[in-house]
Amino acid sequence: MSFAQILRGSRAMASPKCLPESNYSTSHLRFPRLQSITSKKNSRARGDWGLKRTLPKIKTRYICVRQQDSLYKQADFQSSAKFVRLVRNWFDAGFVRDPSEVALLQELLKETGLKDTRDINKVFSPSKQSDENDNFRRYGVSGGIQYSNVPLINSRVTPNCESNCSNIRRRLTAHIISSDASTAYYGLGGLILRLPRTVVFNRNRSSPLFSQEQRISYTVYKNGRLRLVPFSGPELETHLAYPSEDSEVESFFNRDIQLVAKRDSSLDAPVSYQRGIMKFFMAPSQTSNNEANSSEKDNLSNS
């Protein structure tokens, strides 16, 4: 009997717990907060990771276990190699970074065996460093990965963007959080994006198709606003994107979507999508002033 089989049959075996929270806010911002499990090549080919249950066969030798197995719910896992690919994609998109983050990416590339054909040092230079939007660092915009703030949106205005036009327009992937009969919720950098389900008609029956990933095209304006549209289909002018509160940023993607559903039901009237984004990326004082100005305009128009 192998050591992995002994561990799997033992009641004392448990998945590694999450790393303890630190008293310093910047002590672990650039490093994963979840422990990883590694396995030999011949073991992982069989899906044998030394846990109580056999996991699906995957090529990478890094997985992250988010919580312990219980009688009612088994621990979900994901590949740590996703983090490396996500960082590379966001670097290609032209996001702000510093030398320590570039060094972190190089170490991850060595560990995972991925080859980087580009010179990462050419991407970052102090002379070309653009101003960062404090709200992006504050809310941890990380493309759906909550344990790192490596990707930061570059809000620099280029000479070609003189008016309120976009200076960044890229495509990215938002991962599913929850869904119901008619709506799908995706997590994207501390935001919850609500999209309607798509229905595809075939010869036999019409069934709603729901994908675990959604291709999103986003546009960053020079005033700091962020606009999200589907890769194909109508623009999201009538759909809301809800930001996470300060206390929910760390565990936002591990929480139930019902918290956001309650917040949605508490709204008295539908709010436009752009207004929700403005309230997220603007300071609270500016938001209150804008709401006061809008209410004054409404009163004048009614009078």
UniProtKB/Swiss-Prot annotation:
This is Small ribosomal subunit protein bS1m. GO terms for cellular component: mitochondrial small ribosomal subunit; mitochondrion. It is found in: Mitochondrion. Disruption phenotype: Inviable. The keyword Ribosomal protein applies. GO terms for biological process: mitochondrial translational initiation. Its main location: mitochondrion. Coiled coil: none annotated. The modification N-acetylserine is found at S2. Component of the mitochondrial small ribosomal subunit (mt-SSU). Mature yeast 74S mitochondrial ribosomes consist of a small (37S) and a large (54S) subunit. The 37S small subunit contains a 15S ribosomal RNA (15S mt-rRNA) and at least 32 different proteins. The 54S large subunit contains a 21S rRNA (21S mt-rRNA) and at least 45 different proteins. This subunit is mutually exclusive with mug178/small ribosomal subunit protein L51-b. Belongs to the bacterial ribosomal protein bS1 family. GO terms for molecular function: structural constituent of ribosome. InterPro entries: Rbsml_bS1m-like (IPR016712). Residues 2-13 form a transit peptide. Component of the mitochondrial ribosome (mitoribosome), a dedicated translation machinery responsible for the synthesis of mitochondrial genome-encoded proteins, including at least some of the essential transmembrane subunits of the mitochondrial respiratory chain. The mitoribosomes are attached to the mitochondrial inner membrane and translation products are cotranslationally integrated into the membrane. bS1m functionally interacts with the 5'-UTR of mitochondrial mRNAs. Plays an essential role in mitochondrial translation. The keyword Transmembrane does not apply. Induction: More highly expressed in the fermentable carbon source glucose compared to the non-fermentable carbon sources galactose or glycerol. It comes from Schizosaccharomyces pombe (strain 972 / ATCC 24843). Keywords: Acetylation, Mitochondrion, Ribonucleoprotein, Ribosomal protein, Transit peptide. The lineage of its organism: Eukaryota, Fungi, Dikarya, Ascomycota, Taphrinomycotina. It holds the Pfam family Mit_ribos_Mrp51.
